[in-house]
Swiss-Prot record:
The entry's keywords: Cell membrane, Developmental protein, Glycoprotein, Membrane, Transmembrane, Transmembrane helix
Lineage, opening ranks: Eukaryota, Viridiplantae, Streptophyta, Embryophyta, Tracheophyta
The protein's name in its UniProt record: Small polypeptide DEVIL 21
Biological process annotations from GO: negative regulation of cell population proliferation; shoot system development
Gene Ontology cellular-component annotations: plasma membrane
The encoding gene: DVL21
Membrane topology designation: Single-pass membrane protein
Protein species of origin: Arabidopsis thaliana
Length: 53
């Protein structure tokens, strides 16, 4: 019983760390997507500015 209680605590801690890591990865992906979106807008503006010159 003691072993299962300890392993339960370890699993709980492991799951918590995995959740934190997943949230950090999600945040990083979201930031990268935002950066790519801004770059895409800038490139579109640069390419379309040639049409008006």
């Amino acid at each position: 019983m003691l072993v299962s209680n300890i392993s339960g605590k370890l699993m709980s801690q492991l799951m918590e760390k995995m959740k934190e890591r997943l949230e950090k990865m999600k945040r990083t992906v979201r930031q990268q997507r935002a950066k790519l979106h801004i770059i895409r807008i800038c490139i579109t503006m640069l390419l379309s500015s040639d049409d008006y010159s």
